[in-house]
């Protein structure tokens, strides 16, 4: 999300220009867009696409392995870092979702194997760690959307984190089911609608999108307005 990758162009100004960025397909596409917004269109850093169980060597002594986890954005990974001093496991942001919207599940097999090997230090995401129980699956949100769309008689306005592509896909699917057009309001959201389909992370039915300026041309019960603004998104 923006709170993780938004500072990369600023950091890149201060480090060696032969630095390599490793990330998932969507992550790298979003980072490239950040550089373009920053005014850097040439001499971009080398970006290498990784997937679950991809391994890279860092210097002589460090080996980093990417392990698939589920989160509120696609292409999220934990890092298994092997060093001469020990094994460090960095979870990254994660949410254990057994029925994810994109069907790309946590790589429990590899996590179990790494646990059996032994971990000397785990640095873990702690969001909601003080709350007992399990977080509901994202699919349950889709059910809630369908219930609300069924009841709605006027326009529907949905605020969403721009890079939460799973949630956006659920809104698209529900709008299509109820034969509503979608208007997008928010620069960061428009950018995601440009990027995510190009890397296979959004499936948008033909003719479902309309410009925000065209909303008045449709009846209220024919439109969904998708907007952003959370955490300062433009």
Walk through the language-model features, giving the residues of each.
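His/Asp/Glu-rich metal-coordinating catalytic cores
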Residues: 1-220, 230-234
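Loop/turn-to-beta-strand initiation segments
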Residues: 222-224
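Short beta-strand segments
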Residues: 226-228
